[in-house]
């Protein structure tokens, strides 16, 4: 077919007056998810049709969503230096994964099935500050440094994102 590492079939469903394409993406590194989606959109447009959504059956790796988000941000001339959660949400919207029903990345992305958020990571900043000021030896300097470093990196990313695509920067 037109795309490598992709198996697809399409048909028309009379009762819904819509066409449907079923795709098995064998290797997203050979043919990225967004390339498959864009190709289906192109083929539909040739027939005077429009893609109205997509659906994922089962689980998927995180990387194809991140790649798709970066692709769509590039098309918009925007910086891809945004938080992972924002990239995932952009990919979900851009690929229409939330059009036919809810798409919960916590349930659909393989890596999110195995992530455990420890007590410090899931703690609100004000609670973290209170915990640092307590008599307990942990969290200590390392955790405080990690928070300060991550805030500095976030601020640098914000400045970069504010200047991307603007003349004079």
Predicted segment positions?
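Long, contiguous binding/interaction regions
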Residues: 1-127, 134-135
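Conserved phosphate/anionic-ligand binding catalytic regions in large, soluble enzymes, centered on
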Residues: 132-159
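Ribosome-associated translation termination/rescue signal centered on the conserved GGQ peptidyl-tRNA hydrolysis loop
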Residues: 19, 156, 161-164
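A sequence-level detector of short, solvent-exposed, charge-rich linear segments
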Residues: 59, 73, 144-151, 163
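A structural-propensity feature for long, helix-poor, extended segments
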Residues: 165-169
């Amino acid at each position: 077919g037109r795309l490598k590492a992709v198996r697809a079939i399409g048909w028309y469903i009379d009762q819904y007056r819509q066409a449907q394409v079923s795709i098995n993406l064998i290797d997203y590194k050979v043919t990225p998810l967004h390339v498959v989606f864009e190709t289906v959109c192109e083929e539909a447009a040739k027939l005077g049709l429009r893609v109205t959504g997509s659906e994922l059956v089962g689980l998927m790796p995180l990387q194809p969503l991140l790649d798709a988000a970066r692709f769509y941000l590039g098309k918009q001339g925007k910086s891809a230096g945004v938080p992972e959660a924002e990239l995932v949400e952009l990919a979900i919207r851009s690929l229409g994964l939330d059009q036919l029903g809810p798409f919960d990345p916590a349930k659909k992305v393989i890596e999110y099935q195995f992530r455990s958020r420890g007590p410090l990571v899931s703690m609100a900043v004000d609670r973290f500050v209170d915990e640092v000021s307590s008599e307990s030896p942990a969290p200590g300097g390392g955790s405080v440094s990690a928070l300060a470093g991550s805030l500095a990196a976030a601020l640098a990313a914000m400045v970069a994102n504010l200047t991307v695509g603007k003349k004079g920067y």
